[in-house]
Amino acid sequence: MSFPPHLNRPPMGIPALPPGIPPPQFPGFPPPVPPGTPMIPVPMSIMAPAPTVLVPTVSMVGKHLGARKDHPGLKAKENDENCGPTTTVFVGNISEKASDMLIRQLLAKCGLVLSWKRVQGASGKLQAFGFCEYKEPESTLRALRLLHDLQIGEKKLLVKVDAKTKAQLDEWKAKKKASNGNARPETVTNDDEEALDEETKRRDQMIKGAIEVLIREYSSELNAPSQESDSHPRKKKKEKKEDIFRRFPVAPLIPYPLITKEDINAIEMEEDKRDLISREISKFRDTHKKLEEEKGKKEKERQEIEKERRERERERERERERREREREREREREREKEKERERERERDRDRDRTKERDRDRDRERDRDRDRERSSDRNKDRSRSREKSRDREREREREREREREREREREREREREREREREREREKDKKRDREEDEEDAYERRKLERKLREKEAAYQERLKNWEIRERKKTREYEKEAEREEERRREMAKEAKRLKEFLEDYDDDRDDPKYYRGSALQKRLRDREKEMEADERDRKREKEELEEIRQRLLAEGHPDPDAELQRMEQEAERRRQPQIKQEPESEEEEEEKQEKEEKREEPMEEEEEPEQKPCLKPTLRPISSAPSVSSASGNATPNTPGDESPCGIIIPHENSPDQQQPEEHRPKIGLSLKLGASNSPGQPNSVKRKKLPVDSVFNKFEDEDSDDVPRKRKLVPLDYGEDDKNATKGTVNTEEKRKHIKSLIEKIPTAKPELFAYPLDWSIVDSILMERRIRPWINKKIIEYIGEEEATLVDFVCSKVMAHSSPQSILDDVAMVLDEEAEVFIVKMWRLLIYETEAKKIGLVK
């Protein structure tokens, strides 16, 4: 049987090491200790070689060992391992049965871990992925080699790095290879590289064995049957619903004075606003009631959890007391055994003393017999006595050695018992320490949850207060605008009333009218016909341009598309006849529907408002004499013109009426007080009133008189109407193109993933402006909090021109069921942005 060399003495055949050089360390044996250090006996079971030791074995050769500075390869290796950059590893597909402590220990086996970030959901539950940061790139490579596809429970662990980290690892490996090649002398051959590779493999095997031992220790937890397999979908839906209620509460609990329905009715406001406020208050109260019920349920659950925790503490206390009693009984048994052994030793000593006395008596009898013998045998007796004394002394020494051996065995047994008791005490201390750590962890976890809930509540309260203040300011501004509108309408009505009361046809007509109204209208008619002809030519050119664009885009039937666009424009040009004024709610609903139709792919475009034109009265310095036909009319006669100089068609003059499509459209916005239209409700939008309704009071007076002719000056509104019409047409065309582009994008996953994407358009500007904000918003919706690392990972996959299926496989480890919907929406957004940029819809 061979034994390892002494720890503080060099083995035979190997010369002693120089001073200051540590002795070599053998695998499976502890390092040597300095002389004079008290030694504690270690059982043989502890001294057995462990396979998890990471220290490489040193091959001992029969030559003198040099100092550490004579090994430049080892020194360069240590420098390379210490100067590498820190790297981050993505760890996903973590089983729910695997505890966070197991994952931390597995990651720590591969190297020095700087940080381990396990993502938590809004409910506090650990997600199935995390990010580990290693101090050395060698640790990252070892984790990729050993932990990827490692079976933990029912899932295989996923360990990978992004493109940026992979580039860092490749650069570090190239740098390490170059530095190793420069550090080695020229006499080193490829055998050293092969030996280094063998050493790396040997270290990987040792770490792999340690990982297997660790998984065997946690096998009871990993192989435990799942108790929630049947109710898992239902529980998941319930957790998601609770998460939504937790993240988006309707209102926090703030003591406000109770507002009754009578108080609301007492406030002067419109009926629809009063109903809206009543409904909001009812919803608020219902939500408040639901929140109170949820709070009561959560309080009961917290009390049950606290009760279970106290039960566990009492159970641990009873277990601790039971172990103390067991140890006390064990110590009593040890003391009884010790007393029994003491009595046995006392009996042995008595037997020894009895034997000694018998020997003394025998010796005394021998001496008496010797004295009685004759004198001639004195010499013989002397020799015999000498021999007998020698034998006696030999027997005495033998008995002394036997007693010494017995005492040594007794001391050895005592030391063994003392070591056993020490091990028991260490185990008890370790068990108590683990229980205390578990209790402290539970307390910290509960405190962290309470802090997170309090912070979330404060955040929701702050957002709600900001929203309420904003709404209050909006209501105040709206009231001020409404008051200003009423004042303007009253002022305009008063001014118009004073103007019409003071107007005299004979005196004031020369200031505002000149020439023949018929000739003026004929000239206006010719100008309108020329403008219509120009408009027709421009319309034909625009239609031809749209047709050429559709052909360039590869539209299957451009003529049908042009016909459809013309029908749509014709339908919009037709006037809408309103039999009665619509209520405010109907107008708001129509406005909301129109805004929803105008939002393609989450882009809002504000509709362009047509300019509201007011009638302009321009005085004339000099005018010719009024014709005889106009002299017969009175100022209050309702004729073909209004007193303000605006032409009003009459049923008795059909030759002067123009066709509907060639009549100039003039937008007239008049502000009247409440006295002119008492039955009409206040509206947010200004409505165009017919001219007859403004001047209907003149039709009641002198209706039998002959209508008089007046000299009129046409109103010149400039190019504003044309620009507004052109802007509206451009907006409509853009909206149609966006709608047709969205319809062309496939919705099914196979066709969508097979769609050819123009990667040359996908650049960093498009990623930062459109894609990244959308991805960040969706990640917050799915996970419950912002995760910049995951957003960077998805953006890097897109910028690397990865296929959508590969991105879906990677993201499925994190988002589970929502991954497919997320990737489909993201890919549709990519296709839309590239196609829109290609045809010039967006810049």
Swiss-Prot record:
Cross-linked sites for Glycyl lysine isopeptide (Lys-Gly) (interchain with G-Cter in SUMO2): K261, K273, K430, K578, K671, K688, K697, K722
Gene expressing this chain: RBM25
Phenotype upon changing R828A: Reduced DNA/RNA binding
Gene3D superfamilies: 3.30.70.330, PWI domain (1.20.1390.10)
Role, per record: RNA-binding protein that acts as a regulator of alternative pre-mRNA splicing. Involved in apoptotic cell death through the regulation of the apoptotic factor BCL2L1 isoform expression. Modulates the ratio of proapoptotic BCL2L1 isoform S to antiapoptotic BCL2L1 isoform L mRNA expression. When overexpressed, stimulates proapoptotic BCL2L1 isoform S 5'-splice site (5'-ss) selection, whereas its depletion caused the accumulation of antiapoptotic BCL2L1 isoform L. Promotes BCL2L1 isoform S 5'-ss usage through the 5'-CGGGCA-3' RNA sequence.
InterPro entries: Nucleotide-bd_a/b_plait_sf, PWI_dom, PWI_dom_sf, RBD_domain_sf, RBM25, RBM25_RRM, RRM_dom
GO molecular function: mRNA binding; RNA binding
Region (Necessary for nuclear speckle localization), start-end ranges: 285-644
Lineage: Eukaryota, Metazoa, Chordata, Craniata, Vertebrata
Name this polypeptide is given: RNA-binding protein 25
GO cellular component annotations of the record: cytoplasm; nuclear speck; nucleoplasm
